[in-house]
Amino acid sequence: MKTDIEIAQSIELKPIVDVVEKLGISYDDLELYGKYKAKLSFDKIRAVESNPVGKLILVTAINPTPAGEGKSTLTIGLADALNKIGKKTMIAIREPSLGPVMGIKGGAAGGGYAQVLPMEDINLHFTGDMHAITTANNALSALIDNHLHQGNELGIDQRRILWKRVVDLNDRTLRHVTVGLGGPLNGIPREDGFDITVASEIMAILCLATDIEDLKRRLANIVIGYRYDRTPVSVGDLQVEGALALILKDAIKPNLVQTIYGTPAFVHGGPFANIAHGCNSVLATTTALHLADYTVTEAGFGADLGAEKFLDIKTPNLPTSPDAVVIVATLRALKMNGGVAKDALTEENVEAVRAGFANLKRHVENIRKFGIPAVVAINEFVSDTEAEIAALKELCASIDVPVELASVWADGAEGGVALAETVVKTIAENPANYKRLYDNDLSVQEKIEKIVTEIYRGSKVNFEKKAQTQIAQIVQNGWDKLPICMAKTQYSFSDNPNALGAPENFEITIRELVPKLGAGFIVALTGDVMTMPGLPKRPAALNMDVESDGTVLGLF
């Protein structure tokens, strides 16, 4: 079997102008980045707003193994299959972060015969959006430090600056740094740190903003820190939201590419789901809904993280809610959640599949709490056995959830036809009745408790002293009506990454609460979740190279 990059490089791409013609998009509507990538103009985005709204399919997953369960691959393959059965379909997914690409993932543009192309460009610098977000973020840091150096007219307490610098790499050495050293000419010394770009609030803002004016409003609302009198300081106080928006004026426009089978795809924005809201841009998803009859999108990690945030944070900003949720399950992840060691996941173990099903069952129950029908997609691997597949299908039947085997990685669009037909049938026969998990008028504690007890199935939430102080500050400033964005391990329903399966009666500890007023939510930090990842012992970068003719090697 060819590698992902070998498959991608064997495909003859169509000019992006030809790919999007069937959507009613012309050459004049595009801002081209070469022959195969483009941004969609704001004029076209506004022109299609009066079009009917299509069906929305959200793809999520069970709690994953470290390698991931192929959610992006399934998203792409399902869209290709929907087009194959005659449904006018678009994809709306996130742009990969270079950090994980160089670290553990080696690429994040799908896999096998279910990829978005050109995958090398998408995984590397693409249209420059990540760099624009990085630059805007760090421009704000420079402007803050300059304000301190030039007399600090706003009275900013340099010990209470929340804003950090960012870089789109995994670099643990940058988590805590000191800036302004070297004497009076080099600024005011203070503690600082770096996050990964996709953890920046500006990334979340870009993915939730609806136009330039909304972008500026959200940027102005960013709280960068506090004064000596403990009152908040915003970007609006610094009067630099216009400059930041200027840096982002092109990055806010959605990017258009294609799949191996020529399905048009928006790839735009990329916040992590364990430390941010984990969804592609509202602008891309909304525009896709106006252009196609079906839009397939995804939310990061398991349904306890990405899907909950999609439904509680992103959906209220969309013209419609999901008509169906596809939960991706793999037998290896079920076996891991059933207690099997990572090095034994390829061995047949029907009992472990049965034990791990408790994890999938809980995700199905949780999606149903939002009033949306669920469909289970078994992402097929060569190590799967007939006995394991039969056991999983039997278990899904026991909770009355449709289930289909999908082999889109190996077989492309054809391998997703059965899943596509089941999803279309489910949408037709089971209309969604979407409802949010909580009301924003609940207190901060009540909203967190609702997520922990109803989605994670924990018994209690403990708030550390720092978090309690921050809640009081949030209430005092009138920010307590914002939704909650949980920062939690992706491997477990709990805040303990080793508590696999479907743990119950556990307690979750909230160590810190960070107001993200520009994004419009409050981040609740649990466990040891890092906003700047580190590299593994053997990074994927060690296998990467480029030949003299520019051919890329080692992405997968």
Swiss-Prot record:
Enzyme kind, highest EC tier: ligase
GO molecular function, one term: ATP binding
Binding-site residues for ATP, renumbered to this chain: 65-72
Pathway linked to the protein: One-carbon metabolism; tetrahydrofolate interconversion
Pfam family, one: FTHFS
InterPro entries: Formate_THF_ligase, Formate_THF_ligase_CS, P-loop_NTPase
Keyword annotations of the record: ATP-binding, Ligase, Nucleotide-binding, One-carbon metabolism
EC number, as in UniProt: 6.3.4.3
Keyword ATP-binding in record: yes
GO process terms (BP): tetrahydrofolate interconversion
Similarity field: Belongs to the formate--tetrahydrofolate ligase family.
Protein name: Formate--tetrahydrofolate ligase
Originating organism: Streptococcus pneumoniae serotype 4 (strain ATCC BAA-334 / TIGR4)
Native organism taxonomy: Bacteria, Bacillati, Bacillota, Bacilli, Lactobacillales
Gene name as annotated: fhs
